[in-house]
């Protein structure tokens, strides 16, 4: 059962067709999502400028969530990507060759548990016995666990439907599920389109860090490329943190969400790239231990085993 769970967590949802062909020479393959600073970096074209002197081009691939992105890294389809806190934990437990190389500050209000505006569910405690949609192995998986814990509801006392964001929204709108645990920009879009009510966000429960992860061999072979990506992220963070209107306007046609709605997600995002430190390693270890104690990981893991070592 555990093997089945971990396999589904990082390998499910339409990734069987991902190519495992060797990387194109002198190209870095980056996985991104609709959420986070990587998508901003992509739209500004800054990374291409940074990598040109190194003789590298950039290939971008969008994923619906972190688990799917890290399965791509695991099978050799991408070299670098960004996810939240939970996906690399499941991926590490499954043997994915990843390294943590950087992270962003907390953004706890960027994820939430939503219910329909006229739902009789008023508190997290009311979720007992209810059906909740979420993307398996994602940040909101851990967020839901912590929200239930605070409300005195056992994880086993709710019924979870593991669905990627698009399918989860359809289930939520049709009433097939009672609640939906989701992150931005899907969170912001659902608030606007469905008038969904926020039952709880991550405030006081989770940090909701954004992590940057690199494939081990690629990192060892091309440390200067990884450093250039991080330098570009640091630069784009500094540019974006006070330009929420501009960022929303630029990303709107790319992610398919109107700029005024997307601005809410941009404002809830955190900015300021940080090197991996002992404090965030300890936070990640706590999350990993929680999943293991609930029987959701096949083995205990040590986050410190997959941290990029300083290059100098």
Describe each model-derived feature in a short phrase.
Residues 43, 65, 69, 84-87, ...:
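Stable alpha-helical elements in mature extracytoplasmic
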Residues 19-25:
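Sec/Tat signal peptide C-region and signal peptidase I cleavage site
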Residues 1-9:
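Bacterial N-terminal signal peptides that target proteins for export
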Residues 86-87, 160-161, 165-253:
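Pocket-lining segment of extracytoplasmic ligand-binding domains
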Residues 289-312:
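Conserved C-terminal helix/tail region of periplasmic/extracytoplasmic solute-binding proteins
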Residues 220-296:
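Secondary-structure end/capping motifs
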């Amino acid at each position: 059962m555990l093997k089945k769970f971990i396999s589904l967590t990082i390998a499910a949802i339409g990734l069987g067709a991902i190519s495992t062909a060797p990387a194109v020479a002198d190209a870095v393959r980056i996985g991104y999502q609709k959420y986070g600073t990587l998508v901003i970096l992509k739209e500004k074209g800054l990374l291409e400028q940074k990598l040109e002197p190194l003789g590298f081009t950039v290939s971008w691939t969008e994923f619906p969530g972190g688990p799917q992105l890290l399965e791509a890294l695991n099978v050799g389809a991408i070299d670098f990507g960004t996810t939240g806190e939970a996906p690399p934990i499941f991926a590490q437990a499954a043997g994915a060759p990843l390294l943590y190389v950087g992270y962003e500050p907390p953004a706890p209000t960027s994820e939430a548990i939503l219910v329909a505006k006229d739902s009789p569910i008023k508190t997290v405690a009311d979720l007992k016995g209810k059906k909740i949609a979420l993307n398996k192995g994602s940040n909101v998986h851990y967020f839901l666990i912590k929200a239930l814990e605070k409300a005195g509801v056992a994880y086993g006392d709710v019924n979870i439907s593991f669905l990627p964001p698009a399918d989860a929204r359809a289930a939520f709108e049709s009433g097939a599920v009672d609640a939906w645990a989701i992150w931005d920009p899907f969170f912001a879009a659902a608030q606007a389109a469905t008038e969904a009510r926020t039952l709880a966000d991550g405030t006081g429960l989770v940090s909701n860090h954004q992590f940057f992860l690199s494939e081990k061999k690629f990192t060892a072979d091309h440390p200067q490329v990884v450093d250039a990506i991080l330098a570009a992220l640091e630069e784009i963070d500094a540019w974006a943190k006070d330009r929420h209107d501009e960022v929303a306007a630029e990303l709107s046609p790319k992610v398919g969400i109107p700029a005024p709605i997307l601005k809410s997600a941009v404002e809830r995002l955190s900015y300021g790239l940080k090197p991996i430190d002992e404090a965030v390693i300890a936070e990640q270890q706590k999350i990993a231990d929680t999943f293991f104690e609930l029987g959701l990981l096949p083995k205990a893991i040590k986050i410190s085993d997959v941290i990029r070592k300083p290059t100098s």
